[in-house]
């Protein structure tokens, strides 16, 4: 049985491939666009059966000429995830139409389809639950994800021929994101800031939040891969699910966890947030005007629906997840 992973050389996709490998699954077709060549490193430690360029894959899907038999599932992680990309034509073709074509093909072939949606569909809301009235995207990236989620809702009412699951990823961090540049997680940037400068920067006060007090639902990519595989194991489940921890933690906590994990590797003692700020190991910079009105100062996944689907595993909190991530970066990137 063959499994297809799109975006396989990317951040979440490569972690799904790795998680499949840990189960002994290697009959995997990795689909990606390697024009950004350094992404190959994410797949170098993985076992796959074949690599297929994204554009060739799309062509074969649209013409129904993919040469693989007995496809067990498609994990669709290939998309433009740059929330600051305002090229609507590109975003809608790459994130919406590509996903729609894959959905149609998977339904025709009765293949389970698990795809990446995003918490960006909620915009600046304060309630993050999988309900239409709570979804107000702030940018074309969020809209591209929102629009496809509406397609799934309509298809579910009409009746599906095979499983379809959309995961609304919250703030994901972890190994294999180094190619993402400015779109990599804050934890990634803090690690490199601290190693290079000896301190990290956080946004100052904005939108009623104090220095570094803006909060996010930070979720480890290890947990994201586990949830994807849980639904792969349960093809009877379809729908749209938030994928976060259900906890909202301050950027201050993330920065402190990153700095302290780096300090621990240097044989230095853990410091409190107050001490880190006093010693200027955490510094605050003015909130950028370009982000005002477009920035989510608070996110927290309502994971009630995920739990009702039977997923019982606990999620890493920021400290535990960042400790693991920093150790990985020290071993692989430093």
Curated annotation (Swiss-Prot):
Catalytic activity of the protein: ADP-D-glycero-beta-D-manno-heptose = ADP-L-glycero-beta-D-manno-heptose
Single Gene Ontology BP annotation: ADP-L-glycero-beta-D-manno-heptose biosynthetic process
Keywords: Carbohydrate metabolism, Isomerase, NADP
Alphabetized InterPro entries for the sequence: Epimerase_deHydtase, Heptose_epim, NAD(P)-bd_dom_sf
Pathway: Nucleotide-sugar biosynthesis; ADP-L-glycero-beta-D-manno-heptose biosynthesis; ADP-L-glycero-beta-D-manno-heptose from D-glycero-beta-D-manno-heptose 7-phosphate: step 4/4; Bacterial outer membrane biogenesis; LOS core biosynthesis
Cofactor binding annotation: Binds 1 NADP(+) per subunit.
GO molecular function, one term: ADP-glyceromanno-heptose 6-epimerase activity
Binding site for NADP(+): 11-12, 32-33, 39, 54, 77-81, 94, 145, 172, 180
Binding-site positions, substrate: 171, 182, 189, 203-206, 216, 295
Catalytic machinery residues: 141, 180
EC number of this enzyme: 5.1.3.20
A Pfam entry, by short name: Epimerase
Enzyme class per UniProt: isomerase
Keyword Kinase: no
Cofactor(s) named in the record: NADP(+)
Signal sequence coordinates: none
Comment on protein domains: Contains a large N-terminal NADP-binding domain, and a smaller C-terminal substrate-binding domain.
Binding partners and assembly: Homopentamer.
Family, similarity comment: Belongs to the NAD(P)-dependent epimerase/dehydratase family. HldD subfamily.
Function of the protein: Catalyzes the interconversion between ADP-D-glycero-beta-D-manno-heptose and ADP-L-glycero-beta-D-manno-heptose via an epimerization at carbon 6 of the heptose.
NCBIfam families found in the cross-reference section: heptose_epim
HAMAP family noted in UniProt: Heptose_epimerase
Name of this chain's protein: ADP-L-glycero-D-manno-heptose-6-epimerase
Source organism: Neisseria meningitidis serogroup A / serotype 4A (strain DSM 15465 / Z2491)
